[in-house]
From Swiss-Prot:
Protein residues bound to (2E,6E)-farnesyl diphosphate: R314, Y315
The record's free-text note on cofactor binding: Binds 3 Mg(2+) ions per monomer.
GO biological process: isoprenoid biosynthetic process
Cofactors, names only: Mg(2+)
Protein name as annotated: Aristolochene synthase
Enzyme Commission number(s) from the entry: 4.2.3.9
Function: Catalyzes the cyclization of trans,trans-farnesyl diphosphate (FPP) to the bicyclic sesquiterpene aristolochene. Produces germacrene A as an enzyme-bound intermediate that is not released by the enzyme, but is further cyclized to produce aristolochene. Aristolochene is the likely parent compound for a number of sesquiterpenoid toxins produced by filamentous fungi.
Family note: Belongs to the terpene synthase family.
Keyword Lyase: yes
Protein source organism: Aspergillus terreus
Length: 320
């Protein structure tokens, strides 16, 4: 088995600029990872043992515990299960056309709502159905608030925008949907039991958008080699290369490695902007205790996403 340079989506020579953000992980990470991984190993149709090992090595529950380190102990497993199944579906979509992927996701939407019963012989259907039913049983109001953000994310995954030429600004706007920022925000609120009013959420829209850029670009930096490999081996539509690394490299006429270094500096600027926007919110007397917890949660999403992206084997490229 050959493992080329650039595993974890970035060459070993890439040294990120220092960050003032410090990641935090949920204290139940080991327990919940074992529980959730065990569930999917039992129920998901992995094609072979190699795929099962790759799934465990990706650490989907770990990234969820880094995203939501202050989730309530009795809710973190819901978040882990939801992000895990969405990651697994995302992998399947790479080998489908946009039309096939859209049909696949659209079939899951009414099942998620509970409007249609699942086919119990199809794991993805009953996993999705059972998960949403259990989340609604725990907190129907907050679970229902996650539905539309999840559907927005699922539809962005198969949006033909991915195949169109985009500048960096247009790309970041698209990725706000594709990276699932609204989904992550709603799932964070659910996992923390954090109820915010529409007016409170309106006050942090700019902070949300800023966080989305950071999440998207950090993922792009570390997943570039994996995405490049996928673009050559997966479906021509589902596996299309759509990344800020490629866009900046082409627009600025620099190498992919140079583009990564520039993008990392931008990420640090977005961190500074996050701090400035949060300080302004407080100075204007608009920060409630709920919003203070929310914007702190966004900071943990950014730092946690970066730590996971640096270390996950999901972004490794392994060639047999």
């Amino acid at each position: 088995m050959k493992k080329p340079n650039g595993t974890n989506g970035a060459s070993s020579s890439l040294e990120p600029p220092p960050s003032t953000f410090q990641p935090l992980c949920h204290p139940l990470v080991e327990e919940v990872s074992k529980e959730v991984d065990g569930y999917f190993l039992q129920h998901w149709n992995f094609p072979n043992e190699k795929a099962r090992k790759k799934f465990v090595a990706a650490g989907f529950s770990r990234v969820t515990c880094l995203y939501f380190p202050k989730a309530l102990d009795d809710r973190i497993h819901f978040a882990c299960r939801l992000l895990t199944v969405l990651f697994l579906i995302d992998d399947l979509l790479e080998y489908m056309s946009f039309e096939e992927g859209s049909a696949y996701n659209e079939k899951l939407i009414p099942i998620s709502r509970g409007d249609v019963l699942p086919d119990r012989s199809i794991p993805v259907e009953y996993i999705i159905y059972d998960l949403w039913e259990s989340m609604r049983a725990h907190d129907r109001e907050m679970a229902d608030e996650i539905l539309e953000p999840v559907f927005l994310f699922m539809r962005a995954q198969t949006d033909r925008t991915r195949a169109r030429p985009m500048g960096l600004g247009g790309y970041l706007e698209y990725r706000e949907r594709d990276v699932g920022k609204e989904l992550l925000a709603a799932l964070m609120r659910f996992s923390m039991g954090l109820k915010l009013s529409p007016s409170e959420l309106q006050r942090v829209r700019e902070i949300d958008a800023n966080c989305s850029k950071h999440l998207s670009v950090v993922n792009d930096i570390y997943s570039y080699e994996k995405e490049l490999y996928t673009s050559k081996t997966a479906h021509s539509e589902g596996g299309i290369l759509c990344t800020s690394v490629q866009i900046l490299a082409q627009e600025a006429d620099v190498t992919a490695e140079a583009a990564k270094r520039v993008l990392f500096v931008m990420c640090r600027e977005w961190e500074l902007r996050h701090q400035l926007l949060v300080a302004r919110l407080s100075a204007e007397g608009l920060e409630t205790p709920g919003l203070a917890a929310y914007v702190e949660g966004l900071e943990y999403q950014m730092s946690g996403n970066e730590l996971w992206s640096q270390t996950t084997l999901r972004y490794s490229v392994v060639v047999d």
